[in-house]
Design a protein with these regions (language model features):
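Polytopic transmembrane helical bundles with strong interfacial aromatic enrichment
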Residues: 1-191
Length: 191
């Protein structure tokens, strides 16, 4: 068991980020409620770009680097990164998926027949899998890591075990993000 002893770091969870979560959810609700196609599309594209870009960066750039980094460097990166992703990633995934559904309804994609509806079904399947993976695994791991890093003697072996699975899950998420880009470009060019 590897432990690092230092001063008690205090709370690393940045609770004030909940204001940003509330603001993002409010913008989403407004975009859906006023049924403005441009605003709904903007919120969907913006949140989807954030979700996709961060997933791809984390899964294919940062993950491999951290797996090879010194344990103290990994700890510091996790202490800085985890609190930021704790609220950001669930929020962008919820906003992207929800606005995507309402956008599909507003554009008539949900009324398509087969085989065209297969593209809609593929998008729904991918978003559902990514959201379940994100909210059901990645977010809890983020919470566990945050709580462990707040301890004076954080168990880095335990954290490394969680983070190993975390980065594999993020790489899986990134692969699904690439698949959904294929589906979205099909929507954009016409089904």
């Amino acid at each position: 068991m590897v432990s690092v002893s230092n001063e008690r770091p205090g709370s690393i969870i940045r609770w004030h980020y909940l204001w940003y979560v509330a603001a993002a959810l409010a913008v989403m609700v407004v975009a859906i409620a006023i049924q403005n196609l441009w605003l709904l599309n903007y919120v969907h594209v913006f949140s989807s770009l954030l979700w996709t870009g961060i997933d791809l960066f984390m899964g294919f750039v940062l993950g491999p680097i951290l797996r090879r980094a010194d344990i103290s460097a990994r700890r510091e990166v996790m202490r800085q990164l985890t609190p930021r992703t704790l609220f950001l990633m669930p929020t962008v995934s919820i906003v992207a998926g929800t606005t995507g559904w309402f956008l599909a309804v507003q554009l008539g994609y949900t009324a398509l027949g087969w085989p065209e509806y297969g593209w809609v079904a593929a998008a729904l399947l991918l978003v559902t899998l990514m959201t379940v993976l994100g909210l059901g695994f990645l977010t809890p791991v983020n919470v566990f890591v945050c709580l462990e890093l707040q301890k004076a003697n954080a168990d880095l072996t335990k954290i490394n075990g969680w983070m190993r699975w975390y980065f594999y899950a993020v790489a899986t998420q990134g692969t699904m993000q690439i698949a959904i880009i294929v589906v979205m470009t099909r929507f954009r060019t016409g089904i």
